[in-house]
């Protein structure tokens, strides 16, 4: 899905026109969110966001995976597997599954941590525990009430914030903000920007801790791409954020090709990218998530195959994040 431009502008005639639908959608979503969920039997940390689209949940999940392992935990990620055909529950096997089976994000994460995909999230809990999960990390699912969360960590892109702060379809919010704030345990702002700080102020005013983090590119990949004119393409929630990160790393972006989030690349898409790269003598670069969806696709000219631009999340104050996680795990196990 490609987000409408008016979602990220001050309230417009489009958002006003869609307000009645938003009120209905928001009321139903808020009522569903208030339903009780099952107890997983192990602590559950949910990494979610207030709005549809990307905000940096996947790198946050991977950063928390490393933090939890440093505390002696055995995390297992639980994902709905958006874009995959398998309903699950199934343990993702990178050697046997493709993005069309389990979704691009679960497949990408499975290279680093055990990942269970289950369209009905509650059904995936047993499989996660069978693989010795001491903690379940939910990738998304904040608005899904089926599993009780012991820590709900909300991720917001500092540069984008919440757009026009209207509920879908008038804006990007999944439900009205007040019920979401009530269920938020902490906020993580990724990157810098006034839009993110506005969200941080509101969450802090509600008495919830606010953390900050930055996405750091792989230095080796940056060095290998330096000095090469690039054609950058991305099918993620916010392609422009990817393009900005490339430029912020000092790389020369000659052309950009944004695609909708989770875009299933066709042979025509690949041919168009290769033709442009050949014609303009550009190297292709994309995100790790997009490269996962392209895995197994043939390239007539292997030297033109795209290179991934991996990023990792670094907490500004890892000690504070670690302390919150430890307290929440302890409280969950004591209850």
Swiss-Prot record:
Sorted alphabetically, the keyword list is: ATP-binding, Kinase, Lipid A biosynthesis, Lipid biosynthesis, Lipid metabolism, Nucleotide-binding, Transferase
Q: Which reaction does it catalyse?
A: a lipid A disaccharide + ATP = a lipid IVA + ADP + H(+)
Its Enzyme Commission number?
Answer: 2.7.1.130
Give any Gene Ontology cellular component: plasma membrane
The organism's superkingdom is given as Bacteria
Binding-site list for ATP: 51-58
Q: In which pathway does it act?
A: Glycolipid biosynthesis; lipid IV(A) biosynthesis; lipid IV(A) from (3R)-3-hydroxytetradecanoyl-[acyl-carrier-protein] and UDP-N-acetyl-alpha-D-glucosamine: step 6/6
Molecular function (GO) terms for this protein are: ATP binding; tetraacyldisaccharide 4'-kinase activity
Has keyword Lipid biosynthesis?
yes
Q: Name one Pfam family in it.
A: LpxK
Q: Does the keyword Lipid biosynthesis apply?
A: yes
Mind listing the GO biological process terms from this record? lipid A biosynthetic process; lipopolysaccharide core region biosynthetic process
What is the documented function of this protein?
Answer: Transfers the gamma-phosphate of ATP to the 4'-position of a tetraacyldisaccharide 1-phosphate intermediate (termed DS-1-P) to form tetraacyldisaccharide 1,4'-bis-phosphate (lipid IVA).
Q: Which family does it belong to?
A: Belongs to the LpxK family.
What is this protein's record name?
Tetraacyldisaccharide 4'-kinase
Instruction: Give the organism's phylogenetic lineage.
Output: Bacteria, Pseudomonadati, Pseudomonadota, Alphaproteobacteria, Hyphomicrobiales
The protein's gene is named: lpxK
């Amino acid at each position: 899905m490609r987000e409408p431009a008016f979602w990220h502008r001050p309230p417009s005639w489009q958002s006003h026109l869609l307000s009645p639908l938003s009120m209905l959608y928001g009321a139903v979503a808020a009522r569903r969110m208030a339903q009780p969920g099952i107890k997983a039997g192990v602590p559950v940390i949910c990494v979610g966001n207030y709005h549809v689209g990307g905000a940096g949940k996947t790198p946050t999940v991977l950063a928390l995976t490393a933090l939890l392992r440093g505390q002696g935990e055995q995390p297992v990620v639980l994902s709905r597997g958006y874009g995959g055909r398998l309903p699950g529950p199934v343990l993702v096997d990178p050697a046997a599954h493709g993005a069309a089976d389990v979704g691009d994000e679960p497949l990408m994460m499975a290279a680093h941590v055990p990942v269970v995909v289950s369209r009905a999230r509650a059904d995936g809990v047993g499989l996660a525990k069978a693989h010795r999960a001491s903690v379940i990390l939910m990738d998304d699912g904040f608005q899904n009430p089926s599993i009780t969360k012991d820590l709900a960590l909300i991720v917001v892109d500092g540069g984008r914030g919440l757009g026009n702060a209207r509920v879908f379809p008038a804006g990007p919010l999944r439900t009205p903000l007040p019920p979401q704030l009530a269920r938020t345990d902490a906020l993580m702002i990724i990157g810098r920007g006034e839009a993110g700080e506005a969200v941080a102020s509101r969450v802090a005013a509600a008495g919830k801790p606010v953390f900050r983090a930055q996405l750091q590119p792989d230095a080796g990949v940056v060095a290998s791409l330096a000095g090469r004119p690039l054609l950058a393409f991305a099918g993620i929630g916010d392609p422009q954020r990817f393009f900005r990160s490339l430029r912020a790393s000092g790389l020369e972006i000659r052309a950009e090709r944004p695609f909708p989030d989770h875009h299933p690349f066709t042979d025509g898409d690949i041919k168009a990218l290769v033709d442009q790269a050949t014609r303009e003598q550009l190297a292709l670069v994309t995100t790790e998530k997009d490269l996962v969806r392209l895995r197994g696709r043939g390239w007539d000219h292997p030297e033109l195959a795209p290179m991934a631009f991996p990023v990792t999340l670094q907490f500004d104050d890892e000690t504070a994040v670690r302390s919150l996680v430890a307290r929440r795990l302890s409280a969950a196990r004591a209850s």
